[in-house]
Amino acid sequence: MNSIVKPKNLLLALVVTAMGLGAWQSASAAVAQDTLMIGKPADPQTLDPAVTIDNNDWTVTYPAYQRLVTYKVENGKGSTEVQGELASTWTTSADGLTWEFKLKPGNKFDDGSEVNAEAVKFSFDRVMKLKQGPSGAFPEDMTVSVVDPMTVRFVLTAPYAPFLSTLAHNGAAIVNPAAARHAEGAEAYLSTHTAGSGAFKLTNWQKGQTLTMEQNSYYAGPKPTLQKVVIKIIGEASVRRLQLEHGDLDIVEDMPEDQLAALSKKSGVVIGDFPSLRVTLLYLNTQKGPMSNPDARRAVIESLDYNGIITGILGGKAKPLNGPIPQGMWAYDEKLEPMKQDLAKAKADLAKVSPKLSNLSFMYSDKDPNWEPIGLTLQAGLQSLGVNLKMEKLANASMRERLGKGDFDVAIGSWSPDFADPYMFMNFFFDSRLKGLAGNRSMYENPAVDKLIRESATTLDMGKRVELYQQAQKIVLADSVYAYLYQKAYTVPMSDKVKGYVFNPMLEQVFNVGTITK
């Protein structure tokens, strides 16, 4: 791949290299062994567990909160099976509609108040009332009641196959009800603060610079070795790399292939590649603008050089997708063909579009350094067909706001599951009740698909669920709802001083800071 270095980036790198290395070397000596330094390209958008569906936010929220259940760690590896965290035991009725959870005594929020059944009810009622993305993981008619101070009951109106697993995801965080008593209200307060019972709490956030987390002195679990976690916001990947090399950072995220190649040659740096269910795809706005025409969507999908993206931009470190459900997730359909470029078909589909398609916009952010070259690849393919693609780069928070409103033609994003069920890829992507940032980012609506995916979610027979999801996949592929680009391993470079990191494919960008040591 030919690397393009922007003048301002080159200048910054030269200035950093010339002036900053000595400062970083001296700074690294001052970084305490009990402090973990993480480098990210962008601030969180919100820290409210009832609102965020962005793994970038979860680096802060996941360790700050606890949930009724959590993912097991087996032989040092993350598992998709769950075990009790705040819950000691649970029971379910024979029909799968009633679930009761007994809480462990002694858990406290970071202000010292008790974690009890009222707090659990408050948290889930709030999620369902706000109706943001996290609520899509739960049945919309679910009710939560307090049986006694340490017992909580969930009642569903229909069986819900992934229910127990959903209780481990970020949106199931148990929030201190005291958050509602802050003058600005719970929504405003929780967007920039934490109020949980996890091992760490947020103590400072200087936007665009750092987020600082310190131990929660009331945490009832094993005392962490780390005293502090500092997240540094550093937009330039080259600067994140240099700071990792020189000891000012312990972990860095979202690194392009050229920076990973440079890091691979440095002693003291370990690059972890973990099998992942994360997918990258193009959102095609099916509700308005030029992408509301299915022939126009097909032309965009057919114009893209998928192989060039994987081999050129990603250095071969990804595999093609053949539909919504990635390899490694049950209900994956190996009989489907991966997407591929076909300019002749694209030209024929464009000829069917009226009025003629001449201009499109491509919305992306600085969250992932690969997104811009992917956009340029799409631009080249469309240009050969007489379509002009305008590149529109936004701050990540601004882009997500636009996605939520459906204010775009074509946009790019990545998605990884929060629990081990195809629901994450089928119901979130296509259910008409979840349009926008919640998951259905192509704003798609098809009653036949709604029926299939909703039936699958309420069916306990796994074979039947596979059949229903695979039927739905064929329909949405024919409707050209998304362009499925690739499935890529989760790559995280870190200092070899960091010990005990546990990767879980349900928790990308979440670091087990309660058990990591240096």
Regions found by a protein language model. Name each.
Residues 8, 102, 136-180, 204:
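Surface-exposed binding/hinge segments that line
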Residues 40-94, 125, 195-196:
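N-terminal lobe/hinge region of extracytoplasmic solute-binding protein
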Residues 69-77, 168-224, 228, 344, ...:
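Gly/Pro-rich hinge or "lid" segments in bacterial periplasmic/extracellular proteins
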Residues 215-217, 265, 292-380, 384-385, ...:
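Append "and occasionally in soluble cytosolic enzymes with long acidic Gly/Pro-rich linkers
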Residues 216-262, 388:
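Ligand-site clamp/hinge motif
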Residues 492-518:
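Long beta-strand-rich cores associated with HINT superfamily self-processing modules
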Residues 37, 116-123, 149-155, 198-199, ...:
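Alpha-helical secondary-structure segments
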Residues 295, 384, 388-399, 404, ...:
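Extracytoplasmic/peripheral linker and loop segments enriched in polar/acidic and small residues
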